[in-house]
Design a protein with these regions (language model features):
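Basic, flexible Lys/Arg- and Gly-enriched helix-loop patches that mediate nucleic-acid binding at interfaces
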Residues: 1-185
Length: 185
């Protein structure tokens, strides 16, 4: 039989079968888990997903093993490209606790772009200071690219170290605050 997805309903064992072209899962990635589909040594983000949903899905981008927060998992390659391509200028917002006291100097340096080592320079980024103490500051960092360990390398470039890092959003997609670490929807 030929099914018209617009008009026909298909049931199996008295349950309605819905056509889904792509699957999208929002994961609150915990620390200690790697952003990969397979790993021989560490638990992966796909290990957190029920096996019924795992076929063909992959994480959109990567979060370091010690970073937590928003990770989109999908089988939609076009969407992944739209979110990750530096040419698309999609904002990625992170909350960070960093060593040292941040001020106007760091804001200006982030705005200019930073030499992050290995002959690479970050694009302009936004730095918003939430709390600044002598020992530690809390900041929001907005970047439009995703170079390897980029936020950590940017912090190092201004003489600081990341103590805690969490991705809050990618473009208009924001981490659901109701999701506990390791949960997805």
């Amino acid at each position: 039989y030929k099914v018209d997805a617009e008009q026909d309903q298909v049931e199996f064992d008295h349950k309605l079968i819905q056509f889904e072209q792509f699957h999208y899962l929002m994961l609150h990635k915990p620390q200690g888990v790697v952003s990969a589909t397979k790993d021989h040594h560490d638990q992966t983000v796909l290990d957190l997903i029920h096996e019924d949903y795992r076929k063909g899905i992959f994480p959109v981008g990567r979060l370091d093993k010690d970073t937590e927060g928003l990770l989109l998992i999908t089988d939609d390659g076009m969407l992944a490209h739209e979110l990750l391509s530096p040419r698309k200028h999609v904002d990625k917002v992170y909350f960070a606790k960093v060593s040292g006291q941040f001020g106007e100097n760091e804001i200006a340096r982030f705005k200019e772009g930073l030499d992050i080592g290995n002959g690479e320079r970050s694009k302009q980024a936004r730095l918003q200071i939430l709390k600044a103490d002598v020992q530690e500051s809390e900041v929001l960092i907005t970047i439009m690219e995703g170079k390897f360990h980029q936020v950590k390398r940017m912090e190092k470039a201004v003489g600081s170290e990341v103590l805690y890092l969490k991705r809050l959003s990618m473009g208009s997609l924001k981490l659901d605050e109701e999701l506990k670490l390791g949960e997805y929807r």
